[in-house]
Amino acid sequence: MSLLNPVLLPPKVKAYLSQGERFIKWDDETSIASPVILRVDPKGYYLYWTHQSKEMEFLDVTSIRDTRFGKFAKIPKSQKLREVFNMDFPDNHFLLKTFTVVSGPDMVGLTFHNFVSYKENVGKDWAEDVLALAKHPMTANASRSTFLDKILVKLKMQLSPEGKIPVKNFFQMFPADRKRVEAALSACHLAKGKNDAINPEDFPESVYKSFLMSLCPRPEIDEIFTSYHAKAKPYMTKEHLTKFINQKQRDPRLNSLLFPPARPEQVQALIDKYEPSGINVQRGQLSPEGMVWFLCGPENSVLAHDTLRIHQDMTQPLNHYFINSSHNTYLTAGQFSGPSSAEMYRQVLLSGCRCVELDCWKGKPPDEEPIITHGFTMTTDILFKEAVEAIAESAFKTSPYPVILSFENHVDSPRQQAKMAEYCRTMFGETLLTEPLENFPLKPGMPLPSPEDLRGKILIKNKKNQFSGPASPNKKPDGVSEGGFPSSVPVEEDTGWTAEDRTEVEEGEEEEEVEEEEEEESGNLDEEEIKKMQSDEGTAGLEVTAYEEMSSLVNYIQPTKFISFEFSAQKNRSYLVSSFTELKAYELLSKASMQFVDYNKRQMSRVYPKGTRMDSSNYMPQMFWNAGCQMVALNFQTMDLPMQQNMALFEFNGQSGYLLKHEFMRRQDKQFNPFSVDRIDVVVATTLSITVISGQFLSERSVRTYVEVELFGLPGDPKRRYRTKLSPTANSINPVWKEEPFIFEKILVPELASLRIAVMEEGGKFIGHRIIPINALHSGYHHLCLRSESNMPLTMPALFVFLEMKDYVPDTWADLTVALANPIKYFSAHDKKSVKLKEVTGSLPEKLFSGIPVASQSNGAPVSAGNGSTAPGTKAKEEATKEVAEPQTTSLEELRELKGVVKLQRRHEKELRELERRGARRWEELLQRGAAQLAELQDPAASCKLRPGKGSRKKRIVPCEETIVVPREVLEGPDPRVQDLKDRLEQELQQQGEEQYRSVLKRKEQHVTEQIAKMMELAREKQAAELKSFKETSETDTKEMKKKLEAKRLERIQAMTKVTTDKVAQERLKREINNSHIQEVVQAVKQMTETLERHQEKLEEKQTACLEQIQAMEKQFQEKALAEYEAKMKGLEAEVKESMRACFKACFPTEAEEKPERPCEASEESCPQEPLVNKTDTQESRL
């Protein structure tokens, strides 16, 4: 955690970008080329260009997906444009001057902005540096204050021809409520007419912040501020802010030595940064407005910034990582119809994906160029070489770590396969890994190389020919028809066995058995089952044999048909990869989850969507990540919830496309069951509490909104989804939700869990959301900037939330944890509670309901057969009549300590304090006004001053700071104006006091009613639970008694068989024992039932008495509050006169002589008078 020093700083804009450069912008569709000046604003928010007509166009840097220069940039197709740029001349240098910016809301809806510079190589620099700004992790994860600053920057750049900010731009920027925008502009003394304009000099950052505070007030932050600052003070001191940061904004699980708490000098730096008032900065004080901007700053980011960069160990074997993977990458729409595009390979790789899929099919004459398409569907084709070229360009723009090309090869032509291999070798060059690394040979038991070892490399996943002899070009593979298309008989898949295996007799025999079993299984399948299997797998089951050229490119990622987990463990080859449809993977996960996890510790697996997902929808990847599956492939063109989760999680670790699995999913000596509900070894479970407090600028319309909070993790994790109520009004600017926190009590593996927070309109329309891994969250108050469905940052919408994370502690150990944290405090409180309980109950029973023991012989000797008929039920009766501890009900003292009651009392105390503070302030205002009116009757130089006293929570009244010089005419005789002023002020003070005391009385009566109702509600809940527990215990004890009596019956029968061997005698004695047993059980049950009924009656009597006591308390406290009110009303007249005398004693010397008092001096001592303040008032609200 780095609260005071953010790990990642925002990107820096190079000087030449903000100064601008001349370009020609061209568009192929319109065939128009126009000169522009291209710039980036100094803060790096916008790329914008200005036409000769002074018209400006903006492009948000967060929407930029790629920049390209040279041969990878767009080339004009229009002949008119080609002539403009002299492209048909042989010595043309167009490729050295051009660059293209690609932007769009998702990977499919793209826009290409094409620019040509006047100088060579300028476009290259612009392309590289603009992409660096767009890809910087803090561009998309900026603080709330940064996103608000973006609005100001744009307003100041969109100027009218006169160089002013049009007011209509404000209405366009904040369209939800025009009246509120007008009111906020008026509050800042700015023009508000639609056709008006504002001078940029009149709208600096300070005015903009005031405008935002007027447009979007933050009462919820004011409440937080009030709870931590000095009472009745409009500021928070440095010490209070330090306490707030260390208590609320700091993760309580952190070690205080390794991560020391905030220090006052660090907090002073925060005050210097965020406090708008210079005077407060000098005094080390933070105002409520400063608090708002502090909570919007980067120091309070909801994310741990270090998780955004590469922070994980990248030297582990490749199969120890989750790998960002794509399915049918070339598709832009559905699986059955729609266009295919090589551009998708670029976009997917730019998003951080490290495994893309190429479905290769044989090209048609005359070119016979291999193509990529979805076989046997209506999707369009793209050339294989175009896809390879796109991959070569974009493979390592976002991440330097290895890219895996997953080939689904249906090209049955050796010549076309050779052409494919040649394209790969030529276009990928040295980045293509064709031979195993020296330290990681392809041998059983050897681990895979790490992402760091394979840095900058491209790996091919394709069938590998295991025979040393070259493939015959004239021989057609099995299962391929003359027309070149696969026949209905699927080609046998490679099992990943090497030529080395075939020299071993035992393994060879084993292979034959496996093949025979597969053939038998295939023969036993009926036609419908075969069709179903093919529909689930798509065309993956119809791959053809790999010929030598393609086979030679395969090394660490060799596909193999999955036989069984045992078979794979026996082979122990880490370079073998099996692919599963989501259905097959789910079946394996359901039947053998722990074996699946162990399999993924050793080698890699790939999961892909079932073939029936024609709409390109996705399955939830979480279940397969839980099993450790590395390549969980999804359809990147569909931005549904599974894809959103995938993109959100792989944004972390530097968007490298690799996330290190947890230790227990990597170590062979650890066992992990994804369906476990218990504690997992070496993992500390986490408890997460989230309170959704408010939202800001959620929608462009005035609508009611709600928030959904959802947890993704293991099946054994707690409740998955919560939802707030609808916002009270159709207010999308600053809605507030006053609800209890949502608690996820026991998150078993935080490293495998993530939190989704989504905002919806009343009708369910999506507004924005955010998905964040649990281990990347910070505790405290945070502004959560929302994202679109395609994970693009939204500038305006945000949520204000409170997060609290702590280590999970079971309820049974909660007291022990508290005791260990603060032993002295815990045992002191425990002793006090014990004393109170003893006073109420007289003793402290160890158990509320003790079990009813069944009597047994003291010496433990077996019962003889002759004892079976004597005194039936006597011992059972003795057992049933043994003394049972009477159950106790919850006492009044315990009810008062319940969380719900305590919380309500604290709220009431706060309300009373606020009421008293307002009354005291009104009293003081009346006295100050009277003093000011008196001053008007005197010389201006001799005015009476009032100042707040020190050392008090409330403001006290001090009569004067200086001796008042009274005019001669006032001393010689009473002035009627002064007397009228005195009478009027006395009457106002009397009315104010009566009104204040009535308000306090009414509020206290209301508080008493609410607290009594709360106690009654909790008491009834407790009592219902007590009765239920009592009945359950009674049933358990009865069953236990019957079991013991049954065991005694069997002991008697066994003892009897040892005494006599006569069958007739044995039957007779057995009947006697059984009859005696029945009588004993009946007597014991009857006696126990009577005892328990008596105890239940006593328990119900105690509960009724408790409820009556609670009801009686209401009347007592109402009477007490009324008595206090009457006493205060009686003393109000004297209190008013005393306040009047204290304030005007210097102005009325006659009164001062009648009641001598120490003269008023300009001292630091405060006046002893404290109007309307009763120090015990706040305590009296507690029952």
Swiss-Prot record:
Bias (Polar residues): 857-869
Tissues and organs where the protein is expressed, per its UniProt entry: Expressed in the gustatory cells of the circumvallate papillae. Not detected in non-sensory lingual epithelium, brain, parotid gland, liver, uterus, lung, heart, adrenal gland, ovary, spleen, pancreas, intestine, thymus, kidney or muscle.
Record GO biological process: detection of chemical stimulus involved in sensory perception of bitter taste; G protein-coupled receptor signaling pathway; lipid catabolic process; phosphatidylinositol metabolic process; phosphatidylinositol-mediated signaling; phospholipase C-activating G protein-coupled receptor signaling pathway; release of sequestered calcium ion into cytosol; sensory perception of bitter taste
GO MF assignments: calcium ion binding; G-protein beta/gamma-subunit complex binding; phosphatidylinositol-4,5-bisphosphate phospholipase C activity; phospholipase C activity; phospholipid binding
Domain PI-PLC Y-box as annotated: residue spans: 550-666
Cofactor: Ca(2+)
Cellular compartments per GO CC: cytoplasm; G-protein beta/gamma-subunit complex; neuronal dense core vesicle
Cross-referenced SMART domains: C2 (SM00239), PLCXc (SM00148), PLCYc (SM00149)
Cofactor annotation comment: Binds 1 Ca(2+) ion per subunit.
TM region(s), chain numbering: none
Enzyme Commission code: 3.1.4.11
Residue ranges of coiled coil: 1077-1146
Keywords: Calcium, Coiled coil, Hydrolase, Lipid degradation, Lipid metabolism, Metal-binding, Phosphoprotein, Transducer
Acidic residues composition-biased segments: 503-528
Enzyme class: hydrolase
Region (Disordered): 462-537, 857-888, 1150-1183
Role, per record: The production of the second messenger molecules diacylglycerol (DAG) and inositol 1,4,5-trisphosphate (IP3) is mediated by activated phosphatidylinositol-specific phospholipase C enzymes. In neutrophils, participates in a phospholipase C-activating N-formyl peptide-activated GPCR (G protein-coupled receptor) signaling pathway by promoting RASGRP4 activation by DAG, to promote neutrophil functional responses. This protein may be involved in the transduction of bitter taste stimuli.
Subunit structure: Interacts with RAC1. Forms a complex composed of at least WDR26, a G-beta:gamma unit, and PLCB2.
The protein's name in its UniProt record: 1-phosphatidylinositol 4,5-bisphosphate phosphodiesterase beta-2
Species of origin: Rattus norvegicus
Record lineage: Eukaryota, Metazoa, Chordata, Craniata, Vertebrata
